[in-house]
Amino acid sequence: MASRKLRFAIFGNTYQPKKSVSIQKLLACLSVRQAEVIIEREFYTFLTDGQRLPIEGVSIFDQSDFNADFVVSMGGDGTFLRAASMVGAKQIPILGVNTGRLGFLADVKAQEIERTIDALYEGDYTVDTRAVIKVETDGQPLKGYSCALNDVAILKRDNASMITIHATVNGDYLTTYQADGLVMSTPTGSTAYSLSNGGPIIVPGTHVFSLTAVAPHSLNVRPIVFSEDCEIKLTVESRTHNYLVALDGRSENLPETTRLTLRKAPYRVKVIKRAGTKYFHTLREKMMWGADQRG
């Protein structure tokens, strides 16, 4: 279906030597298609210096300084999240090739690379659009990318004591959490950190976010689901006078005087899904629902 040369931007993690076979397969497939290939510098260095792969005919880019028709993430969901942060608001669809472990986002297996690339050229795929959380501060600005595809976590640090988090929704007081932290999750991130803290699984495409406490002091505290159009404001109190904020695992320390505003970002991330991919099949497979582990 594609009548012009397509450009593919490739991201990957740098701690899985086994992915060298997968990247070689991907590059060979794209070469046959005469695609233009650009590789993030850190990943390129890992492949050429660390793995000593002979990679030719590609260009190199740094972090978010690129443009492309498609982005390919080689790794697990963590690599996909990093790629998504680099894509930002560019609206470039992302394909996740799983060389990691769980792989909700990176759900293309290495042995499926060739036919998946063929499907891209033939237009035989769908694109999911996923909501993103944007974080704003009223004091010290965040040092890195201020949006999260999975979740935003506010956590205690350097102390066994809990933190206190005052939360409002659209200006209305919600509650005061006394806990080790609080996780605001998108539907995409609902099967990640939020789930491990008892949060709900939310089907992608559902226009909601959730708040889930991390080890709350009160058993009456329960997760809450609200419209993605809501604005959440958080004020933190801590005995150490600071706290940790983590956006898709990218963390930094903030003084407790810094108040946070969390809302839906003005763009969505485009996630490539192969034709015929069913969310509930993936969910059932990854969560091993119905699997008999008795041996």
Which positions does each model-derived feature cover?
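ATP/NTP phosphate-donor binding region
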Residues: 1-70, 111-126, 137-146
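Short gly/pro/ser/thr-enriched loop/turn and capping motifs at secondary-structure boundaries
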Residues: 46, 100-105, 201-202, 218-219
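Short glycine/serine/threonine-rich phosphate/pyrophosphate-binding segments
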Residues: 19-20, 78-83, 191-196
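Short glycine-rich anion-binding loops that position phosphate/pyrophosphate groups of nucleotides
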Residues: 15, 77-79, 102, 188-190
